[in-house]
């Protein structure tokens, strides 16, 4: 398993310019699938090691790194305008849809435009019978996207839109199985398959590069949203929403439900609590004044009748917006839709679903709230303070939106941005909270604050925010900063890099941000002219004339301001549990013996239904591909291995729209063990400290003006068949091909000229890293548990955990004090890391671009390599560290748990076979999904097999259980031995696995994946062999694998991140099963 840890200030534009989830800073976003259930929290981690879908999915499951929440996304600020130009030809493969043809299918053509920014023809249709609007976007992008979006404003915080979003995918009229969604997860080539809930709308998007597969997905989703079984089946509502659980009348009653436990996890995270309070306080008079995701205190108030009525009212074509995008036949799109839409008559639902504007306050509001905190540390230093504004009571014009997004980036977008820099350098807090512009809802919001604030400094933070904004309005911005921001934006637009996220879905979400409010859906897709006008205005009038009035009018002189102070309360989590227990005791006391017996019977009935598999004949109704639709060979990336000045160079000749992508790889093998935990901070220091001639602000601006971004991070992985791990530092950069010389000069400047002399900045890095790790513990405890188990089972896991797990958090606590006591020693250690690692010997350069650019850039690479020093040190260090094998419980203040168990199956003599990937996926999507999520009530449960190390692990996420979940893990071998799958089920599992292996990748991701395979010794021949083994997986392979994974049951280690109460209960039930560590 690859593990990467990046520094906080990564300037990688893959993280900086496209982080889709940045569009939801305050919104609630629910993800329905088992893998997606793990994507939301993981967005707060720091980096992915591969941009691929499969790699992303696998890494997120292990809680590894994706772009930092502190790294600002330009797409966040420009979500309405910065649409990526799809690198396709505009000429469609199919003829246009004529007016007569549309009329025959029941549609009228409302408007039609060629969107040059995405080289696409976009046509807006209206279904004449229902009024449903359809946007049909045609181009040659093979990654086709479909989405249906409903306006779904809740009136309370019972979570009704969220529970419905989970439930409609649990069977429908044409697909009456328990969960057709899971069947699609098992056997589709989807590049995106999910659903999510905003505060005012619910989205159901899918994507695939295979046309047959794509329309299978479309049909299942259309049938699910319009004709779901859940409105007639209370069991689905109980399973996904909430229900009373009573296994025996003598036991206590408990609440169960997937959404209920998901939201318990959400309400255990201080940052999430703050975001919800801010949104609701800013808009108390409309739907944003409640929580669409659901407050755990309110969810049990929701009735099945209200649930059904909400679907009847809002899930109607008249209230829907439908999106198609890609290279498929536009006439076929309408043909498919007409079959569904023609079944309905027009509905008044668009009137009842309209969102009313919140009127601006006449005076500011101040709130003081509590959040659940641990007992460790000085609680008086754990306050949070955030100032929030609702910026307008009317929609902003396009020019103002663009300028506001630009302003947001100038103030907060990089570590050198003035508002961000001043707040973090003030010493008043540890990290930013609620930082920046949020414009995905009807009215834009702006919020900024700090956490880790001392009680006596709370007022000072508010004063500093206001004073800094006044100063920026009065003085304006540095010209270099404005130029750097503009280059950043323009590079982002040209690059069109959405990572593993489908481009068409990015466009859909931007279009829907206006369309859902009955505004022009084309407007968010057209940025060229507004951006050109803004550049012209800045050039003619100066940036101050553009931005200062915005600060003054929308922020400083705006009385619609809500200041929120969050106070730590070590009793809050316990109090909430006691309150819930008291409610349930009263419920039970009010029941008769007959009532209790009936509840126990109903509990058993629900569990029996949940654990009874669908019959094979029912499963056959869910459309799927066959093995004949699957390519027999993997996708090969063109790779030429050569050298420049004696250094190995990998070249990948791919079309990149005149952009050069490069990675320079250095070996960690010679580093002293004691310096390893300093490596992430070393990487951050390279990017965020100045040189002899340049301040870090000047250096940051230079990177923004000349390149598309530079990042530095460590990467570790086991290597199959070897004891020593692969451990590297990777420097990634990108620029226009014509600026490659600037890129390599700046990379050299960062590596060799940055000075480790700024004690106060380094102390900030440590505090920010500690705050970020503490946030990970609360929100992504499964990642912490996985890292901890890996550290017990293999060397690479230990190295990664030292740089990004609980051990790293403990190191940061110690380091915070040491910065004041021994800064000279720390500075010296950072220099020693540089001398040990950043050298020519063992260096590898990876480049991805078109052939001409690769040739032209060689001189720049040669010059860069010539400037690298030779490493005179004495060779590689032997890495042999591991944590002691033991069951461990990490205590945090939480209402839900994260439960893991792992073991090394190679220790049993198991030899890797491609069937292992098929079997692991099948276990996750059947046994663990049914038992841990559906029956157990956890938000997520899955297994993961790291073929490099041999570690097989189980993990659960936002789980109400602990020992019960471990028992489910231990039953997996018996589940496999008792399995009797038919050929159709087996084929589906194989196809789903190939979908992961053949994940859709953009050119930079292809080049990076090829580099990773090179580093790990994975050959194309091995990839072909594994593919053949996947395609020929048999039932016998499942039975044989059962014996291998029994080692996890018999000799595995368990790690839980959980509440003190649940850990105490587990240790009482199984005599000190866990060794306990307190983390927060």
From Swiss-Prot:
Effect of residue 256 to C: Inactive under oxidizing conditions and fully active under reducing conditions
Residues annotated to bind Mg(2+): 705
Known tissue expression: Expressed only in siliques and flowers.
Result of changing residue 262 to Q: Loss of activity
Temperature dependence: Optimum temperature is 28 degrees Celsius. Active from 4 to 40 degrees Celsius.
Activity control: Inactive in the absence of MgCl(2) and CaCl(2) and full activation at 10 mM concentrations of either ion. Completely inhibited by the metal chelator orthophenanthroline, but not affected by phenylmethylsulfonyl fluoride (PMSF) or N-ethylmaleimide (NEM).
Cofactor(s) required, per the database record: Zn(2+); Mg(2+)
Misc. remarks from the entry: The 2 enzymes halves enclose a large proteolytic chamber spacious enough to hold peptide substrates, but sufficiently small to exclude larger, folded proteins. Since the active site includes residues from both the N- and C-terminal part of the protein, proteolysis can occur only when the chamber is closed. Covalently locking the 2 halves of the protease with disulfide bonds induces a loss of activity.
UniProt-recorded name of the protein: Presequence protease 1, chloroplastic/mitochondrial
This protein's encoding gene: PREP1
């Amino acid at each position: 398993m690859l593990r990467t840890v990046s520094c906080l200030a990564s300037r990688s534009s893959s993280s900086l310019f496209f982080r889709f989830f940045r569009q939801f800073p305050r919104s609630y976003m629910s993800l329905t699938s088992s893998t997606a259930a793990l994507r939301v929290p993981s967005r707060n981690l720091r980096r992915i090691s591969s941009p691929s879908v499969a790699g992303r999915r696998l890494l997120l499951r292990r809680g590894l790194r994706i772009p930092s929440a502190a790294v600002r996304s330009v797409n966040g600020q420009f979500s309405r305008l910065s649409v990526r130009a799809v690198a396709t030809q505009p000429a469609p493969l199919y003829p246009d849809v004529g007016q007569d043809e549309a009329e025959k299918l029941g549609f009228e053509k409302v408007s039609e435009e060629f969107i040059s920014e995405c080289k696409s023809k976009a046509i807006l249709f209206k279904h004449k019978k229902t009024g449903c609007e359809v946007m049909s976007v045609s181009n040659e992008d093979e990654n086709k996207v479909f989405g249906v979006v409903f306006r779904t404003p809740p009136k309370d915080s019972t979570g009704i839109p969220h529970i419905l979003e989970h439930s409609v995918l649990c069977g429908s009229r044409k697909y009456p199985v328990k969960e057709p969604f899971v069947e699609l997860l098992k056997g589709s080539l989807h590049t995106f398959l999910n659903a999510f809930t905003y505060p005012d709308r619910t989205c159901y998007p899918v994507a695939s590069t295979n046309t047959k597969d794509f329309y299978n997905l479309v049909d299942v989703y259309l049938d699910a949203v319009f004709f779901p079984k859940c409105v007639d089946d209370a069991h689905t509502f109980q399973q996904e929403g909430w229900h009373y659980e009573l296994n025996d009348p003598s036991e206590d009653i408990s609440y169960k439900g997937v959404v209920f436990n998901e939201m318990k996890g959400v309400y255990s995270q201080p940052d999430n609590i703050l975001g919800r309070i801010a949104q609701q306080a800013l808009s108390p008079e409309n739907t944003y004044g409640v929580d669409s995701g659901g407050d755990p205190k309110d969810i049990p108030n929701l009735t099945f009748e209200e649930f059904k009525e909400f679907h009847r009212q809002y899930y109607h074509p008249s209230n829907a917006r439908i999106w198609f995008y890609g290279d498929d036949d536009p006439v076929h799109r309408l043909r498919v839709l007409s079959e569904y839409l023609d079944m309905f008559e027009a509905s008044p639902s668009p009137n009842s679903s309209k969102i009313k504007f919140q009127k601006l306050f006449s005076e500011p509001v101040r709130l003081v709230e509590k959040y659940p905190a641990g007992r460790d540390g000085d609680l008086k230093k754990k306050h949070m303070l955030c100032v929030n504004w609702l910026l307008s009571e009317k929609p902003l014009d396009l020019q103002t939106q663009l300028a506001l997004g630009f302003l947001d980036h100038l103030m907060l977008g990089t570590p050198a941005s003035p508002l961000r820099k001043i707040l973090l350098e003030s010493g008043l807090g540890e990290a930013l909270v609620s930082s920046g512009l949020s414009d995905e809802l009807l009215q834009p919001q702006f919020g900024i604050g700090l956490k880790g604030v001392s009680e006596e400094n709370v007022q000072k933070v508010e004063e500093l925010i206001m004073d800094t904004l006044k100063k920026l309005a009065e003085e304006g911005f540095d010209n270099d900063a404005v130029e750097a921001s503009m280059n950043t934006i323009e590079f982002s637009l040209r690059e069109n890099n959405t990572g593993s996220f489908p481009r068409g879905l990015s466009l859909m979400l931007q279009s829907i941000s206006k369309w859902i409010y009955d505004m022009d859906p084309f407007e968010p897709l057209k940025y060229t002219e507004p951006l050109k006008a803004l550049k012209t205005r800045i050039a003619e009038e100066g940036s101050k004339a553009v931005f200062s009035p915005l600060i003054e009018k929308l922020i400083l002189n705006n009385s619609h301001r809500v200041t929120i102070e969050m106070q730590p309360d070590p009793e809050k989590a316990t109090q909430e549990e006691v309150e819930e227990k008291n409610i349930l005791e009263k419920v039970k006391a009010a029941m008769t013996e007959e009532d209790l017996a009936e509840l126990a019977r109903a509990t058993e009935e629900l569990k029996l239904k949940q654990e009874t598999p669908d019959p094979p004949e029912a499963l056959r109704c869910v459309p799927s591909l066959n093995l004949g639709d699957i390519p027999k060979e993997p996708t090969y990336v063109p790779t030429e291995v050569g050298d420049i000045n004696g250094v190995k160079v990998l070249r990948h000749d791919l079309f990149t729209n005149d952009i050069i992508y490069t990675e320079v790889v250095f070996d960690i093998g010679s580093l002293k063990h004691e310096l390893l935990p300093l490596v992430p901070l070393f990487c951050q220091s390279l990017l965020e400290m100045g040189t002899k001639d340049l301040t870090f602000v000047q250096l940051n601006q230079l990177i923004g003006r000349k390149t598309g971004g530079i990042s530095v991070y460590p990467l570790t992985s086991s290597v199959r068949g070897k004891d020593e791990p692969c451990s590297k530092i990777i420097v990634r950069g990108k620029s226009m091909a014509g600026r490659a010389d600037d890129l390599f000069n700046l990379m050299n400047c960062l590596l060799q000229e940055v000075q480790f002399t700024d004690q106060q900045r380094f102390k900030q890095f440590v505090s920010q890293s500690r705050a970020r790790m503490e946030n990970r513990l609360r929100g992504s405890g499964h990642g912490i548990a996985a890292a901890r188990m890996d550290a017990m089972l293999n060397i690479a896991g230990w190295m990664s955990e030292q740089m990004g797990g609980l051990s790293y958090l403990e190191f940061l606590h110690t380091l915070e004090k040491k910065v004041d006591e021994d800064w000279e020693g720390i500075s010296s250690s950072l220099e020693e890391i540089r001398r040990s690692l950043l050298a020519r010997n063992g260096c590898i350069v990876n480049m991805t671009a078109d052939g001409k650019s690769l040739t032209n850039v060689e001189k720049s690479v040669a010059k860069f390599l010539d400037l690298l020093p030779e490493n005179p040190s004495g060779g590689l260090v032997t890495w042999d560290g591991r944590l002691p094998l033991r069951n461990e419980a990490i205590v945090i203040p939480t209402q839900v748990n994260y439960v893991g168990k792992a073991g090394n199956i190679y220790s049993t003599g198991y030899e890797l076979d491609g069937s292992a990937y098929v079997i692991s996926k099948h276990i996750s999507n059947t046994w663990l999904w049914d038992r841990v999520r559906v029956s157990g009530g956890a938000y997520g449960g899955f297994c993961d097999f790291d073929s490099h190390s041999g570690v097989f692990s189980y993990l659960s996420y936002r789980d109400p259980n602990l020992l019960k979940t471990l028992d489910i893990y231990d039953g997996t071998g018996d589940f496999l031995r008792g399995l009797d799958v038919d050929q159709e089920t087996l084929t589906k599992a194989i196809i789903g696995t190939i979908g992961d292996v053949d994940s859709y990748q953009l050119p930079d991701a292809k080049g990076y994946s090829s580099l990773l395979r090179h580093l790990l010794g994975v050959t194309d021949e091995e990839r072909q062999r594994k593919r053949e083994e996947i395609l020929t997986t048999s039932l016998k392979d499942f039975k044989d694998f059962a014996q291998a994974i029994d080692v996890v049951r018999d000799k595995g280690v368990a790690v839980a991140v959980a509440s003190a109460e649940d850990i105490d209960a587990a240790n009482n039930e199984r005599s000190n099963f866990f060794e306990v560590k307190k983390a927060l």
